[in-house]
């Protein structure tokens, strides 16, 4: 069965009672102010059709979803061995901002989707690009077809002000020799990437290359190779949802990436990209109602990579 607006609307009605059972991220003050009753879903098919329900055109802070975009950009700039010499490809089994594992593993982060790994990717981008922040913004605007996407400067400043733990992660990696640039500019770029403001429709369009062998459905142009697409989807399936990746694979069965802003993107290779948003999070930091919505969609349309 193909997704329809009616199916999406029904799913949102079914998950709405979950609102109130999760917790909006409050360690970033600007995120704590987001109304907890927001709920959205958007599907972008490989034929270029948008199907949506709820607050699907409203922008929100994508947070860690941006880590998949930064890694994609790094894969366009570096040979794969240059990236994987500095960051691993394994699930962490620890909190996304853990210092303990990083210390034990000599400053090499487990994967590019935990904070330490994404900070290494930001360092890689800083080494190759004269203006990495602007380049990432242009990249996202191009892939989404939305020239109005911006960084939320209030969120970025809020993250920088409350980002001591991320600074500790960066300095710890530098002490192990796994850092090339000055820490503060790299962190500023990292925080800005997390502060990208996008809607579910924007996100579904932006990530369409992951469902289409590396070619953006929105632009018709290649972003990465089919092999790199397979690699990105594999990492998303195993590491994309913090310490809840196994649970997500079990329930939803699609490669995905979440953010503490309450967004999740999910990929059905060869068919479609999906984005959901509900700000309340579960214990792993993933959208509570958003995960349930994806689980229901997977069941209704009979799609899973497993």
UniProtKB/Swiss-Prot annotation:
This is Glutaminase. One of its GO terms (molecular function) is glutaminase activity. Substrate binds at residues 64, 115, 159, 166, 190, 242, 260. GO terms for biological process: glutamate biosynthetic process; glutamine catabolic process. InterPro entries: Beta-lactam/transpept-like (IPR012338), Glutaminase (IPR015868). Belongs to the glutaminase family. Its EC number is 3.5.1.2. Homotetramer. It is an enzyme of class 3 (hydrolase). It catalyses: L-glutamine + H2O = L-glutamate + NH4(+). Keywords: Hydrolase. It comes from Vibrio parahaemolyticus serotype O3:K6 (strain RIMD 2210633). The keyword Hydrolase applies.
